[in-house]
Curated annotation (Swiss-Prot):
Name of the protein described by the UniProt record: Immunoglobulin lambda-1 light chain
PANTHER family hit by this protein: IMMUNOGLOBULIN LIGHT CHAIN
Keywords, comma-separated and alphabetical: Adaptive immunity, Cell membrane, Disulfide bond, Immunity, Immunoglobulin, Immunoglobulin domain, Membrane, Pyrrolidone carboxylic acid, Secreted
Localization of this protein: Secreted; Cell membrane
S-S bonds: C22-C90, C138-C197
Function statement: Immunoglobulins, also known as antibodies, are membrane-bound or secreted glycoproteins produced by B lymphocytes. In the recognition phase of humoral immunity, the membrane-bound immunoglobulins serve as receptors which, upon binding of a specific antigen, trigger the clonal expansion and differentiation of B lymphocytes into immunoglobulins-secreting plasma cells. Secreted immunoglobulins mediate the effector phase of humoral immunity, which results in the elimination of bound antigens.
Positions of the Ig-like domain: 1-108, 117-211
Major localization class: secreted
GO biological-process terms attached to the record: adaptive immune response
Length: 216
């Protein structure tokens, strides 16, 4: 009972088609018309998109279709959309109430439209200041492609110490999100007129500023 073989990755441009193969043996894929396909977005549970080789559950668009020839089953996704970017797994019955699963294929959708980030800057909370800490949080969301650079400034001058920025992660809408944190002492926070988080994405810059005087 070894895993069914799938290509590790596949890609296609928006609107195009992509086909994923799932190769087994005459004891599983070739022997039964019980091949299913699952779609799994990052951090989410898998969802059945095809069962019994070529049947679609209600709610699954007809852009998804399945077929089988000999010991190989195939899933075709036509008219690719951004939300089709996910991992896809096949499975097949192999007798004696057993099922065997595929190795999985990561599908990348190319040519998605650029989306500029939404940036929100939060000052330290009063509770945190009372605990003798001060953290500024810069939330960056809804951007594509998934790369940004973040710079912090105090009164317009660059700040490098105490900065931590997360790696962008994919949101459920297929755009990306990241966070950047600036750790200060309450004295540092109160000794400047303003702090800024500057986010650069695809050559464009968004800057958000907070001032200690606005928050007691």
């Amino acid at each position: 009972q070894s895993a069914l073989t799938q290509p590790p990755s596949a890609s296609g441009s928006l609107g195009q088609s992509v086909t994923i193969s799932c190769t087994g043996t005459s004891s599983d894929v070739g022997g039964y018309n019980y091949v299913s396909w699952y779609q799994q977005h990052a951090g989410k549970a898998p969802k059945v998109i095809i069962y019994e080789v070529n049947k679609r559950p209600s709610g699954v668009p007809d852009r998804f279709s399945g077929s089988k020839s000999g010991n190989t089953a195939s899933l075709t996704v036509s008219g690719l959309q951004a939300e089709d970017e996910a991992d896809y797994y096949c499975s097949s019955y192999e007798g004696s109430d057993n099922f065997v699963f595929g190795t999985g294929t990561k599908v990348t959708v190319l040519g998605q439209p650029k989306a500029n980030p939404t940036v929100t800057l939060f000052p330290p909370s009063s509770e945190e200041l009372q605990a003798n800490k001060a953290t500024l949080v810069c939330l960056i969301s809804d951007f594509y492609p998934g790369a940004v650079t973040v710079a912090w400034k105090a009164d317009g001058s660059p700040v490098k110490a105490g900065v931590e920025t997360t790696k962008p992660s994919k949101q459920s809408n297929n755009k990306y999100a990241a966070s950047s944190y600036l750790s200060l002492t309450p004295e540092q926070w109160k000794s400047h007129r303003s702090y800024s988080c500057q986010v650069t994405h695809e050559g464009s810059t968004v800057e958000k500023t907070v001032a200690p005087t606005e928050c007691s």
